Amino acid sequence: MTPDEEHSIICHLDKLLEERSMSLVDLSHHVGISVANLSILKNNRARAVRFTTLTALCRVLDCTPGDIFTYKDEGKDS
């Protein structure tokens, strides 16, 4: 397996938005990021995240980066 296949970062925006009764469009307005880019992030297709984006998400969602993202090492036995 390549390093990209052995692990992944999982985005939990869906769960956080649901818990806050907030839509992706609402979040987009609050953080100043397009719905398209938030959708890429939400669907685990983002290759990188800027610290300014992460800071804005944490501020608006009142959470930490660890609430938004978790690391899953798919190469290890669970």
Predicted regions: what is each one?
Residues R45-A56:
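Short, basic-rich loop-to-helix N-cap that marks the start of a DNA-contacting helix
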